[in-house]
Amino acid sequence: MLLWLTEILSQYFSSLTVFQYLTLRAILGILTALLISLVIGPVMIRKLSQYQIGQAVRDDGPQTHLSKAGTPTMGGALILVAIAISTLLWADLTNRYVWVVLLVTLLFGAIGWVDDYRKVVERNPRGLPARWKYFWQSVIGATAAIVLYVTASMPQETSLYLPFLKNVSLTLGPVLFILLTYFVIVGSSNAVNLTDGLDGLAIMPTVMVAGALAIFAYLSGHAQFANYLLIPHLPGTGELIIFCGALVGAGLGFLWFNTYPAQVFMGDVGALALGAALGTVAVIVRQEIVLFIMGGVFVMETISVILQVASFRLTGRRIFRMAPLHHHFELKGWPEPRVIVRFWVVTVVLVLIGLASLKIR
């Protein structure tokens, strides 16, 4: 929106051409989203407390979690508001990638909002039934996949690139592309949701991965950088640095209130949306495998749940003391802050490995 305005006004005030630069708009996007989160956050927390929109805690979970009962939840709405406003202000709104990512994020957030609303307002412990949750996730994920395939104009937009290998890619037909995109978006959404069980555990890795994806988006959209680094050149993806920057700013602002001991939880409205956002950006910049690496914490949490359920159904025994994985470490006696920070450290290492794929071929 402001880009369009500055383009018009730059005819009269040449200094406004500085707003054409992606890097400046990305920085402003980060700061705008951060400011919105910090300003609106206290107001939202008070309102959530006033209307008793608090977190319910399972009796069979770690006993240390019982003190969290009643903590305001659905705070992920704050993140989505900050991301949406900042993106609409600073991104090029004629860019199709911006709209695809933003709409997928908000629609997954809507699914999470309904789930949270039924749990905490209607006092329905099941929330949105799983079959309906996955149905709507599938509809949105598949629709996004079809849109991206139909609007693709170059082969590299629908190819799978293997990191750490020089000029190695797999051409995907419509079926494989749509299936891969669907699984990345829906899988990423649910993986982040499973990780969101401790104060700040999900949001900081999300911020770090989003920051790394912003780098991939910028480099992929720049012909010279992309050719030098042997990554696919995808015109237009550079604008996603604005969205990723807004996510980083909004996430850091939310972490201000979500850090241990949390004043607010993001709920499904935030976790499902942020996971879908990461998956969609990774698909657009053709870094699905790198997302799998950088989001290793999310992957481990998801695999722990799958293994736990499979083991119990097949043998009647559990592999972990409790799943997802972070609860296993809690029940082993690790204090919550230790679990959180160590998972953050793991994410830092994995993100650096993912970024190393830019140069190691």
From Swiss-Prot:
Membrane-related topology note: Multi-pass membrane protein
Pathway where this protein functions: Cell wall biogenesis; peptidoglycan biosynthesis
Cofactor (UniProt): Mg(2+)
An example molecular function term from Gene Ontology annotations: metal ion binding
EC number: 2.7.8.13
Residue ranges crossing the lipid bilayer per the database entry: 26-46, 73-93, 97-117, 134-154, 168-188, 200-220, 237-257, 264-284, 289-309, 340-360
Entry's Gene Ontology cellular component terms: plasma membrane
Function: Catalyzes the initial step of the lipid cycle reactions in the biosynthesis of the cell wall peptidoglycan: transfers peptidoglycan precursor phospho-MurNAc-pentapeptide from UDP-MurNAc-pentapeptide onto the lipid carrier undecaprenyl phosphate, yielding undecaprenyl-pyrophosphoryl-MurNAc-pentapeptide, known as lipid I.
Family indicated by similarity: Belongs to the glycosyltransferase 4 family. MraY subfamily.
NCBIfam families: mraY (TIGR00445)
Protein name as catalogued: Phospho-N-acetylmuramoyl-pentapeptide-transferase
Native source organism of the sequence: Marinobacter nauticus (strain ATCC 700491 / DSM 11845 / VT8)
